[in-house]
């Protein structure tokens, strides 16, 4: 950013927090990057990430999007250091659900230098997010087994059904044309396969239209909605 920003309130005069002046951003980010990569500093990875996230959010280097970028940096660090094979740990849902506590923890660290309570909050967020991720993976595994069994019981449509099911994990909302492409089907064959998938509860039509219909892989999406809702 090239101007002063603030957090909370309608102006600088009643802001809850005023980040550093724009002229200080460069040196502060250099310092943060140096800490980020300084392996001689003996600190556990998650504590390093917690401190770095706090510092990034305090610097607030952009006029908008600081939270999104700050959360993305958490995942990138874990992948870059080989702690995650894939970017599968995102704290956004947890932090959004506990937004007030998140902001309070950051504010307390800034106001009273109580970095310990911030680290405890952050570590608990990681624990709960990892636990939810594990639960989600287990539910997806069970769901996949159930759907595989349903498709295998589709007789002569089983082979094309397996192709469509595999496609749905990458594209959970499809049109009839996408179903045609997924298994190299004719229009009539695609409609027949869609009806088969609807009859066993794999797909649901959700537009209510006569034309240009769309079908959703509802069970798959429901697993992730359950995570967001804390189920």
Predicted regions and their residues:
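FIC/Doc superfamily catalytic core
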Residues: 1-231
